[in-house]
Structure formats: structure tokens, C-alpha cells
């Protein structure tokens, strides 16, 4: 179901918004024990919001743009009066005293908050297996991961447990789970959406964005949460276009660049490659011009990212010491011992690993060899993208090298896990917008996603190209069969 079909249910008058929203809660109560997409539900908040919309309908008043739309929020985005845990023992009982800018905009436009969704601890992971609440299951095969770190958000949309979910994307954390779960995931330009209220992982890379069933729904959510915010100094003061207005525009003559380095990589699954290249031919038949493009440093992105992101994480997570808030170890004899034990017990293995990597890379005598060098390579990666966009309008790659893998496959092999982000991290390093859309299935029936990358602030262009593909491809209408 998309937004427009849900609106028809509202306008039909056969059921109130509150009744329609409660149907989602009934489905969540039935399916969440199997999928583990939600960490907590906000039924009281949702009922209050629903009643407000029903009053507007009763009084024949104009409805706000997202009136009645059931939305889930990733649990690293602050929601006032609700636990915001980052799926970590460190913040398991932390109740946010304020609302994030992005979620606040959604509620002001009539959106309904269903609850918070599961993620890899502090958004560090590609499988949602590092959560203190347990692993989320992929709705297409509950023995497989949904991707990460926004695995709960993607799984909730794919399973029909909400109509849209908000995630965060630091190195692919919206797009990769969207690909694994067969839904649409959009990472906006860095600064397009305010990060106020997003608990920081890597501040120069983090970006909030939507996960939805359709491209048009993603466009609507993006329009709703974008724009200048004085509470976030990195938020861009640029006009926000109506992303819905150009969705159906013909893509005849648009230049799509195929990044050669992505398709030549030995880690790319042949079935994924075949499906994405088949989609390239579909774009050609729709009138797009296809060009081969070289981005020589694209595959250096993964190594660059796994220096820069842990460095920023080690600084951002230094605040969690058990003194002011967060998990606190009891019975220690002095302050230093209490801080050390609180962090050792409060953070999971993957978070501790990245803190150690980041602290080492920033330490005296090593920052030149690692952090500063990685920042120079980051500049070169951005330069490659600039050169590519001098030749084409949009870039195309697979979203992920593989389809969803089995739970436990890479828990003890972090380097292999990191490679799941191979094709997404360069986009974050360059601060560009990108969208993942379903393009096919492998022989196991698992979704395959393709990634469209745009130039800075050209979300409207990738949304247009994605929407035309969506309307032409029947794969978008296929949903997982989850037994209640």
C-alpha cells in the first residue's frame, strides 16, 4: 500500500484514521515477534495524533499533507518523551527530552508515529545483528538479515508494518537495507535534511532520509523533512523544490553513467550484476542515453570510509561515560574505574572495535598516515564524481554486491561485513544524494536493488529517473509473503 491508496481509505469514510492506524498495530502485534523490526511502540501518541486528524475530518477542515500516514522512526532519532536507545545497552533507558527536527516536521504535517525501529548499535553495522534488542529478520526470508544499520526501518516497510520509515545513512544504512528488503531507500544530499536530534555516529557523513514502498512516497517524505534549520549549522539554506512535480517527466535523452569499476569488482554477485545490467537496458528502452563512466578511486571508498567514520565515532561517543546519562556501572571505587567499566559494559563489540580503530588513527604519530591521508583520498573521490557529472546527469550502480545473507554469516568476520557497503560509502564521502530501488530477484527469490546517484541537491533528478523505472518495472509490485 502506498500513501495515495491509504488516503483513499481515509476519504472513503468507511473507517476513522484511528481505526486504520490500529489495524497497523494489530499487524505489528502479530508479526513483530517474528521480524523484530520495532524496539518500542507509541500507541498512546499514535492514538492522540489520529484523534486530532479525525476531528479535522469531522469538522470538514483542510487536512495537512501527511494526515494519517503511519510512520516509524529509527531508534537513533530523538522523539520527545520516548526511549531513544540507539539499540545499545548504553542508552537503553534514555528518554529523549526533545523532538528531532525531521520527526517534528512529520508530526506537524499530520504523520502518525507508530514507534521506534531496530538498528545496529549506534548505527554501526550492515546487518542489524549488533542490536541489544536482538537481530531483525528479513521479511523475504526470516533466516536472513534485513541489512543495516536501518534494518528495522526497511523490514517494517517491507512487511507492511508502516507506510514509511525514517532512517539514517552514514555509509549506506538506508540504501543497503532497502536493497535487501526490496523497498525504496533515499539518502539525500548532505545538509539537505537537518541532523538535529539524530544521535551522531560520524558527523560529516550522517544523513536522515526516508524508506518507503514507492518512489513518490519517498519524494513526499523528503519534501516534508527538508529545508534550513537554525539548530543544525550544517543544514543547507537552499530552496526545497516540490519533488513530486517532476516525477513523471520523460527521461528521454537523460544521460545515465554506468560506473565501470562497480561492475568489474570480483566481489559482485553474478546474479546481481545480470539483474542490474538488464535494468540498464530497460532504461535505454525508455529513452535514456547510456554511457560508460570511469571513477578510478571509487573502490578506494571503503578503506577511506573505515578510517574516517571510526575517527569521528570515537570523538562522538566519548561523551558516554556513565556520569551524566547512559549506562553506569555500579560499585566501582573511583571515577576512572567507573567510566572504564561503564563503557566496557555499555558498548557492544562492534562499537568498541570502531572506537579503538578511530582512537588509534587519530593518535599522535598516526593521524598523518591514516586520518589525514583518508581525508585527501576523500577529496579525490569527490573529484572523480565531479568529473563524471560533467559528462552525465545520473550515475548507476548496484546498491550492494550481494543479496541478503544469512544471519551469523559475518558476525565473526567484520572485514567481510564491511564489504557489504562497498558500493554505497563513496556517495557519503562525497555528500551526494542517492536512491536504491528494487530491480529484480535472485534465484532464491531475494530482492536486488540498483542505486541511482545524483549531483549535489539533484534529488529531483534521481527521483524522476527512479519513478519512471518503477512505473515500467513489475518487480516493484511484488511483496514478501509473511504469515501472520
Swiss-Prot record:
PROSITE patterns to which the protein is assigned, alphabetical: AMIDASES
Keywords for this protein: ATP-binding, Ligase, Nucleotide-binding, Protein biosynthesis
Keyword Signal recorded: no
Name of this chain's protein: Glutamyl-tRNA(Gln) amidotransferase subunit A
Entry-linked Gene3D superfamilies: Amidase signature (AS) domain
Species this chain originates from: Prochlorococcus marinus subsp. pastoris (strain CCMP1986 / NIES-2087 / MED4)
EC code(s) of this entry: 6.3.5.7
InterPro entries the UniProt entry points to: Amidase (IPR000120), Amidase_CS (IPR020556), Amidase_dom (IPR023631), AS_sf (IPR036928), GatA (IPR004412)
Record carries keyword Protein biosynthesis: yes
Any one GO molecular function term: glutaminyl-tRNA synthase (glutamine-hydrolyzing) activity
Source taxon at top rank: Bacteria
Gene it is expressed from: gatA
Described purpose of this protein according to its UniProt entry: Allows the formation of correctly charged Gln-tRNA(Gln) through the transamidation of misacylated Glu-tRNA(Gln) in organisms which lack glutaminyl-tRNA synthetase. The reaction takes place in the presence of glutamine and ATP through an activated gamma-phospho-Glu-tRNA(Gln).
Amino acid at each position: 500500500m502506498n500513501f495515495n491508496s491509504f488516503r483513499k481509505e481515509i476519504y472513503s469514510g468507511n473507517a476513522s484514521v484511528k481505526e486504520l492506524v490500529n489495524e497497523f498495530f494489530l499487524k505489528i502485534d502479530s508479526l513483530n515477534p517474528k521480524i523484530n523490526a520495532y524496539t518500542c511502540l507509541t500507541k498512546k501518541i499514535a492514538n492522540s495524533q489520529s484523534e486530532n486528524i479525525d476531528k479535522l475530518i469531522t469538522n470538514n477542515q483542510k487536512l495537512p499533507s501527511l494526515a494519517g500516514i503511519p510512520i516509524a522512526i529509527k531508534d537513533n532519532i530523538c522523539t520527545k518523551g520516548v526511549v531513544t536507545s540507539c539499540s545499545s545497552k548504553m542508552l537503553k533507558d534514555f528518554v529523549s527530552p526533545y523532538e528531532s527536527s525531521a520527526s517534528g516536521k512529520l508530526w506537524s504535517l499530520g504523520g502518525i508515529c507508530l514507534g521506534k525501529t531496530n538498528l545496529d548499535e549506534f548505527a554501526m553495522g550492515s546487518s542489524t545483528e549488533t542490536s541489544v534488542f536482538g537481530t531483525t529478520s528479513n521479511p523475504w526470508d526470516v533466516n536472513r538479515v534485513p541489512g543495516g544499520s536501518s534494518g528495522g526501518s526497511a523490514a517494517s516497510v517491507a512487511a507492511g508494518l508502516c507506510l514509511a520509515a525514517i532512517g539514517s545513512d552514514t555509509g549506506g544504512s538506508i540504501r543497503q537495507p532497502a536493497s535487501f528488503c526490496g523497498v525504496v531507500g533515499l539518502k539525500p544530499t548532505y545538509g539537505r535534511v537537518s541532523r538535529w536530534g539524530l544521535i551522531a555516529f560520524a558527523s560529516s557523513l550522517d544523513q536522515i532520509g526516508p524508506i518507503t514502498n514507492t518512489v513518490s512516497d519517498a519524494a513526499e517524505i523528503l519534501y516534508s523533512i527538508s529545508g534550513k534549520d537554525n539548530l543544525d549549522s550544517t543544514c543547507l539554506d537552499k530552496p526545497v523544490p516540490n519533488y513530486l512535480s517532476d516525477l513523471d517527466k520523460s527521461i528521454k535523452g537523460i544521460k545515465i553513467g554506468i560506473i565501470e569499476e562497480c561492475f568489474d569488482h570480483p566481489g559482485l554477485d553474478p546474479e546481481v550484476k545480470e539483474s542490474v545490467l538488464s535494468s540498464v537496458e530497460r532504461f535505454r528502452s525508455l529513452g535514456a542515453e547510456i554511457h560508460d563512466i570511469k571513477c578510478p578511486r571509487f573502490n578506494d571508498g571503503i578503506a577511506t570510509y573505515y578510517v574516517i567514520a571510526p575517527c569521528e565515532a570515537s570523538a562522538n561517543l566519548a561523551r558516554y561515560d556513565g556520569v551524566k546519562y547512559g549506562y553506569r556501572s555500579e560499585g566501582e571505587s573511583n571515577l576512572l574505574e567507573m567510566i572504564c567499566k561503564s563503557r566496557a559494559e555499555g558498548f557492544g563489540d562492534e562499537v568498541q572495535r570502531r572506537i579503538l580503530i578511530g582512537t588509534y588513527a587519530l593518535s599522535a604519530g598516526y593521524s598523518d598516515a591514516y586520518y589525514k591521508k583518508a581525508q585527501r583520498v576523500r577529496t579525490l573521490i569527490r573529484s572523480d564524481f565531479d568529473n563524471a557529472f560533467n559528462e552525465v546527469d545520473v550515475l548507476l550502480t548496484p546498491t550492494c554486491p550481494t543479496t541478503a545473507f544469512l544471519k551469523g554469516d559475518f558476525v565473526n568476520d567484520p572485514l567481510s561485513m564491511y564489504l557489504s557497503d562497498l558500493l554505497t560509502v563513496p556517495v557519503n564521502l562525497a555528500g551526494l544524494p542517492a536512491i536504491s530501488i528494487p530491480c529484480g530477484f535472485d534465484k532464491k527469490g531475494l530482492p536486488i536493488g540498483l542505486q541511482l546517484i545524483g549531483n549535489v541537491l539533484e534529488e529531483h533528478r534521481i527521483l524522476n529517473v527512479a519513478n519512471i523505472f518503477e512505473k515500467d518495472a513489475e518487480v516493484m509490485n511484488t511483496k514478501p509473503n509473511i504469515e501472520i
